[in-house]
Amino acid sequence: MSGGRLLRTEVPTAFDRHAAAYDRLVGANPGYHAGLRHAARAFALPEGGAGTRLLDAGCGTGASTAALVAMAPRAEIVGIDASAGMLARARAKPWPVTVRFVEGLVQDLSAEDLGGPFDGVFAAYLLRNLPARDAAPAALRSLLRPGGVLVVHDYALRDGPAARLVWHAVCWGVIIPAGRLLTGDAGLYRYLWRSALDFDSPEALAGRLRRAGFTGVRTRTAGGWQRGIVHTFRAEAP
């Protein structure tokens, strides 16, 4: 940590320590799982994803993987995460034989390393946490086949005070106290609060995707308390 603040390079280890409580925490977040399922539907795959290969980049304990399975039950799905503790939780859950998990940093691996190239890459709550944010979209594009689709689902606070005020209130009123109660350590949840404030606005992230070579970039905000705070981005690899 630097000055008491969790660094992005330390995030996988922090998730290892908090893996046991993670599912309980996100499960208490109204709309968390529904939001992931709604984001996954942006792939718009026909026939349950038959014949397609999907990568769940930053799969964590498998919540985003489950959203992909619900949307594309016939697709081949690979989940990758840098946290061994989170992956252990994911692997312990029941999955179809078409789902497998890999431990590693997604930006350090090639499409061939992961069994790609992929028809779609799902990056849910990932880009904020990668050490090399500027290089990350291009790294994800390299994992896609031509015409493949990237779906990003993440905190990207809309410019202006309203979204930030809601985010401050939710984090300091709910998320950080709950994290401290369940784990005895609120460091990861203070990092979550700060990382969203420091991350791109929706417009900036859309621009980052375009600069990485993606086309057809579209943005959609979540509903409820997450309106203007959580956004889904859909982009295509040329």
Language-model features and meaning:
Residues Q107-V121:
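A short acidic, Gly/Pro-enriched loop at the edge of an enzyme's catalytic core
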Residues D134-P146:
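A short glycine-rich, Lys/Arg-flanked "PGG" loop and its adjoining helix->strand segment in the class I
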Residues V26, A156-R208:
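C-terminal alpha-helical "lid/dimerization" subdomain adjacent to the S-adenosyl-L-methionine
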Residues G148-Y155:
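Conserved beta-strand signature within the Rossmann-like core of class I S-adenosyl-L-methionine
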Residues G120-R133:
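A short SAM/SAH-binding and catalytic strip from SAM-dependent methyltransferases
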Residues M1-E47, A63-A67, W193:
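Conserved class I S-adenosyl-L-methionine
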Residues R53-L109:
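Class I SAM-dependent methyltransferase SAM/SAH-binding core
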Residues A212-T215, T221-P238:
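Core SAM-dependent methyltransferase catalytic element
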